Amino acid sequence: MKSPKKSIHTFQVIIEQDEAGWYVAECPALKACYTQGKTYEEAIANIKDVIAMCLEELKANGQPVPEQPEIISVRRVEVTV
């Protein structure tokens, strides 16, 4: 019996470092798809695993993989209040 064909997906992720020094990774294209790691590399490995789990759940529920929105720019802006 053949195993199901796997497909490759590419997603943009956001990595931030919190106050405690942990790296927090989020995939904006997939709701509730986030994780953390003690190192940057661990956060990247963890977000790949979480994205795979999210995609498997979508597939199991017969839902399509969401379109990856094109991010035009990520910037820091200064605001005075």
Residue ranges and their predicted role:
Residues 1-12, 45-81:
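Short, charged, surface-exposed hinge/linker loops at domain edges
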Residues 3-24, 28:
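N-terminal first-folded block
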Residues 23-57:
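Amphipathic, hydrophobic secondary-structure cores in small proteins
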